[in-house]
Each structure stands twice: as structure tokens, then as C-alpha cells.
Amino acid sequence: MTGRLVQYGRHRQRRSYARISEVLELPNLIEIQTSSYQWFLDEGLREMFKEISPIEDFSGNLSLEFIDYSLGEPKYSVEEAKERDVTYAAPLRVKVRLINKETGEVKEQDVFMGDFPLMTETGTFIINGAERVIVSQLVRSPSVYYSDKVDKNGKRGYSATVIPNRGAWLEYETDAKDVVYVRIDRTRKLPVTVLLRALGFSSDQEIIDLLGDNEYLRNTLEKDNTDSTEKALIEIYERLRPGEPPTLENAKSLLASRFFDPKRYDLASVGRYKINKKLHIKNRLFNQRLAETIADPETGEIIAEAGTMIDRRTLNRLLPYLEKGAGLQTYRPTEGVADGQISVQTVKIYAPNDPDNEKVINIIGNGFIAEDVKHITPADIIASISYFFNLLHGVGDTDDIDHLGNRRLRSVGELLQNQFRIGLSRMERVVRERMSIQDANTITPQQLINIRPVIAAIKEFFGSSQLSQFMDQTNPLAELTHKRRLSALGPGGLTRERAGFEVRDVHYSHYGRMCPIETPEGPNIGLINSLSTYAKVNKFGFIETPYRRVDPETGKVTDQIDYLTADEEDNYVVAQANVPLAEDGTFLEENVIARFRGENIVVKRDRVDYMDVSPKQVVSAATACIPFLENDDSNRALMGANMQRQAVPLLQPEAPIVGTGMEYVSAKDSGAAIICKHRGIVERVEAKEIWVRRLIEVDGKEVKGDLDKYRLLKFVRSNQGTCYNQRPIVKKGDIVEKGEILADGPSMDKGELALGRNVLVAFMTWDGYNYEDAIIMSERLVKEDVYTSIHIEEYEAESRDTKLGPEEITRDIPNVGEDALKNLDERGIVRIGAEVKDGDLLVGKVTPKGMTELTAEERLLHAIFGEKAREVRDTSLRVPHGGGGIVLDVKVFNREDGDELPPGVNQLVRVYIVQKRKISEGDKMAGRHGNKGVISRILPEEDMPFLPDGTPIDIMLNPLGVPSRMNIGQVFELHLGMAAKKLGLHIASPVFDGATEEDVWNILEEAGMARDAKTVLYDGRTGEPFDNRVSVGIMYMIKLAHMVDDKLHARSTGPYSLVTQQPLGGKAQFGGQRFGEMEVWALEAYGAAYTLQEILTVKSDDVVGRVKTYEAIVKGENIPEPGVPESFKVLIKELQSLGMDVTILTSDEQEINMENFDDDDDHAPDAIMVDVKPVESEEADEEKNAVTKE
């Protein structure tokens, strides 16, 4: 027997086929959310206040400083916030100090700065009662990027861009004549020497001394028609501010504020880090030949002679002296923008393609700029220009912008910080204005500060940002994946239309950082990704992945873990996780297959620097739940990973017999389960709560401590309308550890993720009913509620104040019989537990109608009988089509009881209806390998094929679905599942390290099955055996959220679009089926003239005709002639609006007046009791030829 037993949680053992021992535990999978938000609360907010503090007025007399801040206690708990439709938030208070410099008076105050949304323990936010997730965004990192391009004559040119976090872009480029240009903030290009002159290097000679003599610089100087700093500054000013009269002062201050003012230009710490890394001299000398002798600046001792080739060893010897300042040159330009001195570090080298040592190149580094200088400096600009000239001579590298070293993540904390910054800067403007207006002696900080812009900015971000998304809560895996999603879209990111193939493609630097498999199909493919299982995000926002270090001295693979970014990984040779190791950790084989910069290479074992931590570090959490992933084609694996997120939680979940070992971790970290916070003993277990008494160690003995109470959620509606239910899995008296699962959430079984059920599957056809991926199913699965799921829908009715008086929620509804009111209580609200069908009343509500003047008799009758029918109309809430079920809960909110309601609303009633949906024909099901299909037939058990022992099959799949799709993993799963079921085992077969073909054969033998795992099957109808033996086994099948009950829809008459008068489309609008252009052609082709006329007129937009037709059908008369379609009138009006004189003539050229056709229109909609809806403009722009019929 291969495989060993592994314990997952308290309740489940699996036989694991993993061969690779994992050194590193999986991290907490939602850490990307929680740690980022924690950083924001601890440091992000403080940074923001520090950035704008102090705010001074224009005279510099008053100064407002932000000293400290604190978050109070949230007003409502998470559950209350969901129930009351409010935001889960805590009040933010800031300590502010106002200093009056004239009088020396200091006022301190605590100012309330709005409620700040808090993150729940599971990494979500509750905004207006709805759970939302902030998705992390992948953006280009601020830095300097160099790229090459080949023009149409085959000449290679270069371009470079300095991209800040915010501020003006600086771009360099060459043209066909070898002149180097610069663009400042996307304006017209200037020769690059103009920018250098503006910095203070005024003469040609100074520029040549600075950058070194070369033909590109000479060409550029020839093209440059300025000859002094003054002219250069004015030239730049004219480009940036065309049409304004240039003065030297203005020009200087403009350039200085564009680039050297930290408020206007911000690289962020990551930009400074990347620029220092790219432009520092040490990274640019590697593998070059020195053209000068480098000496110790302090002692004059020679370290490297001219002509030395700088290899790794020489560079390491040079480093300390370069750090001390060898080759440091200081310039003190006077007239330029740059005040004070500019320090750059210069080393001369020979051009790489010049054996005669004639060409000497200056390499200029940006000196030593501290990490906290967030704006660009003159030294950076000079060094970036120098790098550009070096590139032209073949020194240096261009950048790959799709490399993950050049893309970084903006997680919740940073996105919030940016939003907060916007709010604070708006507030700062208001504070300045108020300082200058109000009396300086009597003013208080509270009066100065207007918190509205800050609150608005935060609200806008959570409410309407593209990155703030309604949480996908279909099942725990969907929740988890949503929190780990990486999106390249959103503000400051890409757009779907502009993104090319390169951005969407899998890149070698994604290894261990972003999943190559899990991404949506469709227009967003490759733009939305998922974080790999072991990946972490570092302080700069770059994704890191863990590797085991190989000790260079002994050649042993150690258990020391280093997290590397994509940039760092490029310097090392990394071996795969499945390389055979000896007991002591050395490589068994002399040659090892490894990766280096995206290439797979074979190297000697002593050249390996690192080794992968685990085979599943490549993929995301959802992909790691697919067993035998290694045997599936990647396209199908993508569908498998995506469809697991659409699995509906079942009534009786069951963990997969063949799993991967990820099920436990995914379920635990998703936030759907209840996790124990402290070690303790279970004192009480109920359906709604679990009590755990803490056990604390005192003097080596365990003593009972505080009591923790855990509330369980019962039958709550999730965001997607599935049922969110938690069940305890511990017993009274159990001793539980911290981090243990106390209660299963939806789609969980004994602490493991359980999205579907293990069913008996045969690969065979049956009367053609499983043609094209259709699925045939046994009735047993319906009878025994195997695939039954619970769905909860929420309906609400509100009574508002109208102009004619308040609406009223009541049982007294006009023209409604007593039998329709049988389920309503005395308030007019449906009772809990009632069974309701389509169209039944849920909440009785009446709205006042406009009063007509009553006669005296009517007034008398009215006074005597209190007849109400006259002045109100029925606007009750009824069950919509397909919404029938059992009333689960009713919540009533009243303004009188102090509930917070929107303005104008007096009472709000929410009714929850629960449906129990059994599986039926038309429902979509899938396996975990992208093998999806729709149920075409549910057969009685007695008709299903059966095994020799009489067991009927549960599901029949088409064998033709396997070969062309190349997802062989499902066949492995089938056989392994059958054997495990017979042996009573659960199995873990981790991705890329699971059971092999040999293992499957061995377990089949152990279970006493045939080696090919096929069985004779008997036809349930005749009892005869089928001709061939069939593959039968246990497969894990899930029911997806695409259910036929949600899609079935029919309409007789219903709402119409206002302009075209055609029926609306779609189930939500109770619309008709579109009879489009091509369908019209089909009828034309068959010459079906009357059908065609009927479809284009009375079934669509002939307003009068459809009313008359309706009346005729009701009265049983003959159907009248159709009239003129509304779209024809619209067309005429459109032509007339273009200024054309369009008239309609009869056959004998008599003019027809269209106005005559409109006589009957006014009462038309009322006649058939149909509401006419205004509709979005798209609806009106439809092709006139195509109509929507009912």
C-alpha cells in the first residue's frame, strides 16, 4: 500500500499520496486583506495626517496641526449592521492643535471626522447592510522604464519613461536622425539638452563634460537652438503653458513645482526604491570594462585598474568604496532650477562593442538619495538621461513591463489611503479659506474643519469604486477567491478594450505569485487573476513567493525559507519541488532541472541556489482543489476552477472522497466556518450558539477562565440568495484548541469544503439522451434530496409619504376577496410559515389616489359607510413569478420605533421566502475538471443500468466528452473514487504530487477490482447485459448556480418601452422574446405573409391594433386588421427631425395624415391594464427592422 494517513482537523483522516514533504504551512489565505487594512489603521492614516499637517493660512499667522487620531467603538455589531442596512463603522476622532503665531495662543480640540468603515474578521466590509470586498489592483509600479522599438527602416530606437505615483511624466526618445528628445508631461518633444540646460548646465561644454562625448549628444546639441539656461527655461515654459507670456521667474517656479515639489510630484516609497535600484551605479557596472582606475577616496589606494573586467567578485570588492563615494562629483549650477548642489557618481567604461578601447562611456549613477525623498531630484534626471545614452551604446537593459517586478499590488489599505488623501486635500482647501475669512482670535479648530469632503470621498470609494465589489457568497470557495482576487482594471489601471495580448498572457514571473489557470473566460481573461497559495505581498506591494534556501557551502537544501520578489528571483537558479533529495537534504542526481529567468535549464547541482517549497505554490486556492490537475488540459482546468465557485450549497453536503488536502484549509480560511479563538472546553452546544470556557495555564496547571460565546447563523440569505447556515461539529465536554473549527458553514462537511456529492457515474450513452455533454440522472437523486438546495429571496415593501397623503400598510385592500387575505395578519403582513404561490399577497398596501369632487349624496354615503375604495389604489407587494415558497421571516422597521429609514419612508417590511429546489431537467451540473453539462433526462431508478450486485447507476455521462477535451483527470478520479469507496477511505491527491497511474492500479487491486476498473452493466429496462464493459466509478459532481427555475420565463402581455412601444426584453422586466432581423428573414423566406404582418404589428408595437386584438380574443370575435406600427411613426419623426419633408401617400397618391392614427392611443394601455415603462436609450436605438414579440 502506498500513501500514508493524514489527519485534517479533528474529524477527518485521508490517505495522502503526496511524496514531497512540505516544509512550510500554508499561510492564512485572507491575510492579503486583513494585514493591508491593519497597516492602514496603524500607519496609513498617520502618514496622511502628517502629509497635510500643518495647514497654514496665506499670511502664515494661523497654523493647524493634526497630532493624533483614535477609532472609537462601532455603533452596531456586524449582525446588527446587516439587519438594519447600515454601514459597520467606527467613529474617527482626531486631536487637532490650532496655533495663533501673533498671540502665541494654542487651542487643542478633539474633532470628529466621520464614521470609518471597519473590516470584519473575515476580510469584508459591510456597507449599507451589504457585504462587500475590496479587490486588490495590479498596476505598473512607479519607476523609470526603458524600451526598444524597431522603426519601419529596421533601425532600432529606444524610448524611456519616468512614471511617478502622481505627477508629470518625463519621456525620452530617439528619432531616425539619432537625436535624443524629451517630452515633459505629454507635450511636444524638445531636445534633451534643453532640460539639462534648464537644470543649470548652461553651455555645450558643461553638458559634454557631464555626460561624456558621443555622437548622439553632438547630434542633439546641434538640434538644440537654445544656448543658455535662461532660453532653455523659457522654451520649456512655452511648451507647458502655450499662449502665456513667459518670464524667467515663472519658468523657474513652474519647472520646480512640476518635479521638485513633494506635494505635486510623488514617487511613493516604491518608486524611490525602484529608481535607486535601476539608476544606482553598482547595478550598471556588472560585466563592463573599466576605462579609469578606481581608488579609495580616503586613502588613494588603487582598487581596480583601468581595463579590468568587472565580474561578480570585483564588483563585491568595489561596492564598499562605491558606497563611500568613489567617483562622486558635485556640481553647483547657479542659474538653473536646481538650487544648491547636485551630486552624481560617475565611472568611465569602454563601450562593449569596441575592442580598440577608443569609445569611452560615462556611467552616471544618481548618487545617494535617501529612501524618504519621495519626489524626483536633478540627480535622478541626469542619471536617467545617462542610462538612456548608455543604452544607445549597448550598456544596460530594457525593461519588460509585464514582468511582476514591474507590476505591484495596491491592496485595501493603499486604495483607502489614496481616497482619504483626496478627501483631506479637499478639506485642506476649505480650512485655508475659512482661516482667512474668520476672526483669528475667536476661531476654534472645530469651526475650521469641514469633514464633509472626507466622508464623501470614503463613501464614494466604498459605494461606487470599480474595485469595491458586492461579495460573491455563493459558497465558501467563492468568498475566499473573491478576497484573493487581483484585478488589472479599475481607476489608474487598464481598460478591457485597450489591454493587448501581452498583458493578459501568462508570464514566467507569475510562477508562485499569480495562478496561471484561474481567470475568467471572456473579455476579462488575463486581466483578473488570483493570488497563488503561498504568495505574500511585501511592503512595496510586490508579490513574493517562498523558496527553500540551498546552503552554498554544503549543497544541502535547508529548511530556511526566503521570500523572493520576481526581481530577486531573476538572479538565482531555482530547482523544482519534485527534485529527488537524499535523507540529509542533498540533491541525489548530479544534474538538476531548474529554472533561470524563465528558461528551463539543466545545471550541475552545486549551481542551484533555491528550491520550490511545494508543488502547489504555482496555483491558486481554487485550482489547488482539483485532484489530478496534472492530467487535465489547462483550458478545462480553468473552467473547473471557475465552476467550483458557482457550486450551490446543498442540503446535505458531503466532502469529496477524492480530494487534494486543500479542502480543510480553504474552508477554514474562507470565513464561513466558526473558528475557536482560545483553547478551552466546550460547555454547551446548541443550534444557535456554542459556549467555550477558556483554559488558561497558571503555574503549570490549567485553570478555567472566561466564557466565550459563539453565535451561529441559521438560514440566513447570502448575497447570492443561497442559504447560509452553520452547524456545530463539536460535542459538550470536548477540549478544543485555538484555531479549530467549531461549526461548519454552508458547503462544509466535518470542517472540509464540500461543494457537491460523491455519486456513482458510468461513462456510457443511453438512447442518445446524453448527446453534446447532456447528463442523464437517476430519480434516486431527486427522491433522496441528494442535490436539493435551499434558496432564500428577500422582498421589501415600504410605505412612503406621497403628495396626496401617506401610503398605508393594511389588511383592508379594495377589490380583494377574503381568501386572498387568508395568510395576512391584522397588520396586513403575511404570517411566518405560510406557504405562498406566485401572485399571492405578502404585504397589503394602499396608496391614496387623487380626490375628485364628491356630490352631496356620495359624501353622505362616505360618512356613513366609511367607504374607502374610492380614493385609494392597491399597491400591495405580491409574490413574483417563480418566487413561491414558505415565508421564513418577516422584519418590520418603523420610524416611530426609532429605526433609521430613508427620508420619506414611514415603514419598511422585509419578507424572506425560502424555496427548496430539487434537481430537475435543465439544471447545470459539473465535475471538477471542467466537465459541465445540462440534465436532459431524469430516469426512474428501475430503468437505470445496474451493476452485477444490483446497484443502479446515479449518473450517465457521455464518453465522447473526454478525448477531445483532454481532461483525463476525471477518469483517474472515477477509478480511484470507486476503489476508495469500497475500502471505506477518503483520499488526498495533491496537485502535481498526487497518485500516479501505478498508485491507482495498486489501490484497485487492494479493493479487489479489475485492473482496467471496468464492469459489466445490465440494462435496467430489459435486464440484458450491455455488449461492452463500462467504466463505472465514484465522481464528485456539483450543482451549479445556473438553475432552470431562475431562467424559465413566459409572457402574455406586459410592460412596453415608452418610445418604440415594443415589449421590453429580459426576465427581470417580464419582457418578451426578441424576434430579430434574422428571424424576420426566415419568415420572409417562407413567404409567411400573415404571420410576418402579425409579428411586426399586433404582437409588437401597433398600439391600437394590439388593444383591439386583445379585445377580439377576449370576446371571441375575428381579429381586426392591423394598424401602423409605432416604430414606423418614430422613423418618420426621426426623418422629419433631420429637416426632411416626409409624407405618406395612399396608392392613388392621396396624403395620409398620421395624426388620425393617434386618436385611440390615449386610452390604449389602460384598456388592457398594461403599464408602459420608460426605458434606457439603448432600447430606443434598436434596429427598426427587428421587433420584440410577446
From Swiss-Prot:
EC numbers: 2.7.7.6
Enzyme class, broadest EC rank: transferase
SUPFAM superfamilies (alphabetical): beta and beta-prime subunits of DNA dependent RNA-polymerase
Record-level GO cellular component terms: DNA-directed RNA polymerase complex
Gene3D superfamilies (UniProt xref): 2.40.50.100, 2.40.50.150, 3.90.1100.10, DNA-directed RNA polymerase, beta subunit, external 1 domain, DNA-directed RNA polymerase, subunit 2, domain 6, RNA polymerase alpha subunit dimerisation domain, RNA polymerase Rpb2, domain 2
Gene Ontology biological-process entries: DNA-templated transcription
InterPro entries on file: DNA-dir_RNA_pol_bsu_ext_1_sf, DNA-dir_RNA_pol_bsu_external_1, DNA-dir_RNA_pol_su2, DNA-dir_RNAP_su2_dom, DNA-dir_RNAP_su2_hyb_sf, RNA_pol_bsu_bac, RNA_pol_bsu_CS, RNA_pol_bsu_protrusion
Alphabetical keyword list: DNA-directed RNA polymerase, Nucleotidyltransferase, Transcription, Transferase
Catalytic activity reported: RNA(n) + a ribonucleoside 5'-triphosphate = RNA(n+1) + diphosphate
GO molecular function: DNA binding; DNA-directed RNA polymerase activity; ribonucleoside binding
Record text on subunit structure and interactions: The RNAP catalytic core consists of 2 alpha, 1 beta, 1 beta' and 1 omega subunit. When a sigma factor is associated with the core the holoenzyme is formed, which can initiate transcription.
Record family assignment: Belongs to the RNA polymerase beta chain family.
Role noted for this protein: DNA-dependent RNA polymerase catalyzes the transcription of DNA into RNA using the four ribonucleoside triphosphates as substrates.
Name this protein carries in UniProt: DNA-directed RNA polymerase subunit beta
Organism of this sequence: Geobacillus thermodenitrificans (strain NG80-2)
